[in-house]
């Protein structure tokens, strides 16, 4: 998990992600997942560049099983970008910064 990301769970997923006026990148991961930590560091380095244009959130699938099930998360890390509360694109695995930027370009 990245230090600057908003922590989201089943209780606040709707308010932080689905009701957000900004596009939201959601990183679905787990504390035991090595690739998730690598992706989190990459995302943490990107957040400041999107300030005011997008939100970055982290969901621990063990802490938010309903959100993980709702969006069909079967492996971690999985990144989904949301616009107006609706998924607009996704990536699987610890992907590169350029791929994450391409994904965000769909919604920002």
Model regions: which residues?
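Structural microenvironment flanking redox-active thiols in thiol-disulfide oxidoreductases
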Residues: 61-68
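Non-catalytic, surface beta->alpha helical segment in thiol-disulfide oxidoreductase systems
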Residues: 75, 81-108
